[in-house]
């Protein structure tokens, strides 16, 4: 096994988000830049939108003359 080929690991790597939020984590890089974090992601902020796919199901049923009842 070769010595000294592993990348240097930084325990205090800084993660910077586009929204301005910063936090620390462990990484092989000193600084990480991300577009979305837990402070601005819709799932974590409660602004998540539920997509209704019922229209697609109804279109399929209409196309193949299927009824909702079995």
From Swiss-Prot:
Signal peptide positions on this chain: none
Entry binding sites for Zn(2+): 17, 19, 37, 40
Co-factor: note: Binds 1 zinc ion per subunit.
Cofactor(s) demanded: Zn(2+)
GO molecular function: metal ion binding; rRNA binding; structural constituent of ribosome
One GO cellular component term noted in the UniProt record for this chain: ribosome
GO terms classed as biological process: translation
InterPro entries xrefs: Ribosomal_bL28/bL31-like_sf, Ribosomal_bL31, Ribosomal_bL31_A, Ribosomal_bL31_sf
Source taxon at top rank: Bacteria
RNA-binding listed as a keyword: yes
Keywords carried by this UniProt record: Metal-binding, Ribonucleoprotein, Ribosomal protein, RNA-binding, rRNA-binding, Zinc
PROSITE patterns cross-referenced by the UniProt entry: RIBOSOMAL_L31
Assembly mode: Part of the 50S ribosomal subunit.
Function, as annotated: Binds the 23S rRNA.
Family label: Belongs to the bacterial ribosomal protein bL31 family. Type A subfamily.
Descriptive protein name: Large ribosomal subunit protein bL31
Organism this protein belongs to: Clostridium acetobutylicum (strain ATCC 824 / DSM 792 / JCM 1419 / IAM 19013 / LMG 5710 / NBRC 13948 / NRRL B-527 / VKM B-1787 / 2291 / W)
Classification of source organism: Bacteria, Bacillati, Bacillota, Clostridia, Eubacteriales
Gene encoding the protein: rpmE
